[in-house]
Amino acid sequence: RALQWENLGVLAPFDMNKISNLGNVNPGMVAVGERDWNFGGKGSHWVPQLWGTESISWRTDKWTPDGLPSFGDIWEPNPGIDGAFMMGRTYSMMTGCGIWMHHQGKMDFWSSYKDDDTMRKNWQTITDYCISKKANLVKFWSGADPQKQGFTSDGVVVGQTWDGPIVSMMKAGEPVAYQTTDEGALAWVDGITLSAKAENIDEAYELINYSFTPEVGGMTINEIGYNSAVIGASDFYSDATKAISQAVYPGDTASKLNPWPPEPPWYADCLLYTSPSPRDWTIS
C-alpha cells in the first residue's frame, strides 16, 4: 500500500548511508523500497524486515485437504465440511477468492489493478459469490490473536490466515497446519519506516542495524514464525523452524507465490464501496 502513504506526508526518507548493515538484506526486497516507496524522488521511505504469506490453515484433527489446500477451500472445501466452519479477513479472503476464480478461468483477477472499471466488475462478481457462501463463516479476524482463537476456542476448522500465528501454534504442538495453496499463497513484505516527526533519529538507525544482523534476524523468526529479509538469518533458525518451513512450502512452492500488487488510492476507494459490510454477511 505504498501509494496510499505518499500523500499523507507522515514518513521521512531514509539516509541509506546510516544503514551500515543494508548489505545483509535481500537486494530484491530492498529494491521494493526504491521502486514503490521513493516518494517525490527523495529516496526510499521504507526498508524491508520480514516477509510472510497468507494462505490456508486448518485443524488437523478435523480436516485434511486433498493435496495442497486451495483458496477455494473456505468456500467449497475439498473434502466437504458441514455447517459454519471458516474464518478470514474480509478483503484478503475475497482476494483469495479472486485468485481461485482466476485459476478456474472465471476471470482475469490481476487485471483488477489496472483500472477502476475492471476492478469494480471483478469485485462485484467476487462479492456476490462470497455473500452466497456466508453460511460458511464462523468469524472475521483482524489480527494474530483472533486467528489463534478461531482454532482454539471458536470452532473454526479451516481459515485463510497469515503464516506467523499458525506456525507459532504448530511449534507449540497445537493440532493445526498452515500450507501454501495450489494457486500460490499471497506474499507480502513488511518493513520499517521513519516518522517525519521522529526526534530519536540516531537510536532508530541503531535499531535498524541491529535488526539487520543474521543472528537477530534468525532469533526474530524463531519467536514470531514469519520469514526474515536478512540474508543468512536462516543459519540461525532452530530445527523446529527449519522443519516447519519445509512443511509450509513443500517442493518448489516458495517460488510460486503471488505478491500483493501495489494498490493505488483509487483501488482502496473502490474496495471500500464494493466489498460487503458486516451486515451483508449476517446470517438471518
Annotate each predicted stretch with a short phrase.
Residues 1-150:
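Extracytoplasmic ligand-binding site segments that recognize negatively charged/polar headgroups
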Residues 140, 157-162:
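Paired acidic/hydrophobic, glycine-rich loop segments that form the ligand-binding mouth/hinge
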Residues 55-62, 101-104, 188-200, 219-223:
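A bilobed periplasmic-binding-protein/Venus flytrap-type ligand-binding module shared by bacterial periplasmic
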Residues 2, 147-150, 166, 204, ...:
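Short, hydrophobic alpha-helical packing/hinge segments within bilobed ligand-binding/sensory domains
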Residues 273-276, 280-283:
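Single conserved hydrophobic/aromatic residue that forms the stacking wall/gate
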Residues 127-133, 172-193:
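Periplasmic-binding protein-like
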Residues 2-4, 160-175:
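A ligand-binding cleft/hinge motif common to bilobed small-molecule-binding domains
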Residues 185-186, 195-262:
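Mature extracytoplasmic/periplasmic domains
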